[in-house]
Every structure is written in C-alpha cells, then in structure tokens.
C-alpha cells in the first residue's frame, strides 16, 4: 500500500508542548532551564547558575571558582525535595551535567520555532485512491490505509481498526517506552555518580595509604639511624680508650729514651776526661746511674692484636633479608596508631579494606 507521506509535530499538540514546558522549568528562577543543566544526587535538575546562587547563599565564606584560595567545599539543600547536597572543593562545577535534559530543551525550542503552517497536521492521502484520506489501519499488514482499500482493494480480506484507536495505542506504547528509557537513563546516571564517588574514594584511600607507607618507612629509617649512632658511639669510645693507653706508653717510653740518651752523652763526655783524678771523681756516680738506668723496667707493650677492631663488625645480611620480605597484608586491620594519623579533610573509607605493612618478627624494626 503506497501513500503520500505527511507528518505531525514531533512533540504533539499545544497541550503536550505546554506540559513539556512545565517539566523544563527551573524551580529557582522559574524560567526554562538554561544550559548547562546539572543533575543533583537526588536526581532533580537545576540551572548551574541557579545552583551556584543557592550554594553561594548557603556558603557565604566559600571562594568563587576563579579565586586562588583553596576551599574545602560546602553544602546546600535541593529546592525541590530539601535533600542535602554535599559538594567538594569544585563547588557546583563538580556536579554532573544532564545532557538528556539539555537535548530535550534544544528539541523543544526547535519545535516551538516552527512556523504555524508547518505545525498543522497534514493528512495522508491514498495513492491508489487519490481522493481518499488514510483513515484506517490494517492490523494484518500493519500499515495505514483507506476505506476503499478495505472494501475493494488490497486489504479487503484483512482485519482493520480505526486509525485514531491504533494511533492512541501506539502513542501510549511509545510514551511508556520513553518513560522506561528516561527512567533507565536516570538509573544509569545514578550508577555513574556512584562510580565517580568510588573513584574519588579510591584516590582518597590510596593517598592515605601512601602517606602511611612513607611514615612507616621513615620510622624504619629512624630506627636504623638511631642504632647506627649508638654503634658508632661505642666504636668511638673503644678507639679513644685504646689510643689513650698506647699514647701513654709512647710518652713513658719517650721519657725513658730521653733520660737514657742524656746519661749516655754525659758518660761519653766523662770518658774523654784526660785527668785520671778528675775522671775518678765522676766515674763512680756515672757507673751507678748507668747501671740503674739499664735495670729500669718499662711498662709492658700492647699485646699482639691490640690494634684490631674486628669485634665491632656488624652483620646486617639477615636484617636486610627480613626487610626485603616486607609486604602488604590485604584485609588486615590497621595498627592502633593509624587512628592517630587521620588526614585533615579526608573522609570515607567505608567498604574498602586497609593494607598495612608486614614487618617480620625478630628484625628489631617494629
């Protein structure tokens, strides 16, 4: 069945247009939504400008988007349902745009701007019976047709129904389908919002765990530095004690050497004395001094190996091996000190498990 194609406006008659316009009114400015349109967590829509005005009124100390001051966000209530809307530091610019509503507004404005004669319903005429309007619907062939086609033409054996009846039925089906699609879009939008919140929570939790990880490794480094300082002090004390003893012996031996050298010099000068009487006057005393000097017992020398410092060697291989085994413990609750390390301005770890470092026992680095 062939017929001339006409059309009705996409959005229906003036009554439907008025109903649609009512759905596109912003509850704040009472005008049609102006783009961009943002969707709140409660699924109500606002002009972003209007949402920002309400947000600024509820948060007078919050800095505007162009300010260099960092803000921690704020909150306001939806004017439609009074649901509290919590915003991050981006303010209303962090809200999701409702592209579906924006597209509907564009279509509405396009339809509203059509000339009146273009909006008038055009009748479809049957091509086989040029003077007959399309006024019935063939249920068997699922096409519109005219009465003559049913009486004399190709559809005389088909089951037909009045065109308005099928029109209302299919329009109702399409309307239900649109409602389901819009509801589905709302659910998808809600899921997107939830997943964006999950992304934000993942970033917050990761940032917190990174800070805890850095703090714990800094603690390990501090323990190592403290222990290294203690061992270096012990080594320095031993070094000083040994050096003092050896240097004391060096001074004692030096004093003895100096006295012995002077005595040798005096004895040699005495032996060069040509007069026997004068020599004999000094010889007895010198002989006694030389004998006494040769019998002087000096303090003992350092025992063999006294200079060795091998007892201060440190084996760190086993500790290093333990450190290499440090790993995460998925699902383990954080230590008690974790509660004292809460980061300013960070919230929400619900549903996500913390991971903490597993430091092997016996490493001395807990």
Curated annotation (Swiss-Prot):
Zn(2+) binds at residues 126, 129, 149, 155. Residues 194-258 form a coiled coil. Residues 168-211 are annotated as: Mediates microtubule-binding and homooligomerization. Keywords: Coiled coil, Cytoplasm, Cytoskeleton, Developmental protein, Differentiation, Metal-binding, Microtubule, Zinc, Zinc-finger. One of its GO terms (biological process) is negative regulation of microtubule depolymerization. SMART domains: BBOX, RING. Residues 334-347 have a biased composition (Acidic residues). The keyword Membrane does not apply. A zinc finger (B box-type) spans 121-163. Homooligomer and heterooligomer. Interacts with TRIM63 and probably with TRIM55. Interacts with tubulin. This is Tripartite motif-containing protein 54. It comes from Mus musculus. The gene is Trim54.
